[in-house]
């Protein structure tokens, strides 16, 4: 969740306090989309998600905008009904995309995808290095969602907070 405080310029007094979860989710997804635009392969076709919440939904929208070549979206969640909800909400927006519910099977969602997105609060590895093909783009949004080997096999690590990342690779 997020709260935005809008202040007037001259004295800095608050003039509005707003619920900001939607805008915050859109901002995070925009960052992932911009990264995918510049770092993913030229014509990615498959995007895989672990997580089916609001961050994942916003990320699919951002990824599809910058990478319209995406043809398939695979999604895995802890609960199959969350996968179904994700697909029900997003498939009308992208009729040219095939949606695959992985039925809680993270490997089925991620293995061999061109773009991989983990959007959970998990504190245990969910993404395994063997599922990440060379040249793929991985957007890590939440907690500790991947094996250490995922970062160790990466060609590049691009982040917004190097201190957060460096403790993982030592």
PLM regions: where:
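Short acidic low-complexity segments
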Residues: 97-113, 129
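Rossmann-fold NAD(P)-binding glycine/threonine-rich loop
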Residues: 131-132, 136-170
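Residues in the short beta-alpha loop(s) of Rossmann-like NAD(P)-binding domains
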Residues: 53, 78-79, 144
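Short internal alpha-helix immediately C-terminal to a glycine-rich phosphate-binding loop
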Residues: 27-48, 54-66
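N-terminal ligand-binding/catalytic initiation module
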Residues: 1-25, 33, 40-43
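Conserved acidic residues
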Residues: 45, 114, 155
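NAD(P)-binding Rossmann-fold cofactor-contacting core
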Residues: 66-94
């Amino acid at each position: 969740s997020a709260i935005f405080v809008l202040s007037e310029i001259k004295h800095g007094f608050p003039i509005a306090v707003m619920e900001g979860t939607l805008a915050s989710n859109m901002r995070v997804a925009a960052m992932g989309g911009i990264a995918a635009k510049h770092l993913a392969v030229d014509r990615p076709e498959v995007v895989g998600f672990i997580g089916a919440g609001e961050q994942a939904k916003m990320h699919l929208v951002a990824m599809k905008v910058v990478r319209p070549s995406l043809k398939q979206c695979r999604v895995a969640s802890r609960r199959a009904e969350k996968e179904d909800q994700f697909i029900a909400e997003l498939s009308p927006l992208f009729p040219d995309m095939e949606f695959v519910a992985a039925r809680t099977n993270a490997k089925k969602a991620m293995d061999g995808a061109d773009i991989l997105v983990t959007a959970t609060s998990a504190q245990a590895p969910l993404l395994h290095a063997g599922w990440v093909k060379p040249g793929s783009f991985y957007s890590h949004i939440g907690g500790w969602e991947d094996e250490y080997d995922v970062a160790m096999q990466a060609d590049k690590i691009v982040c917004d907070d190097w201190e957060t990342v460096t403790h993982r690779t030592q």
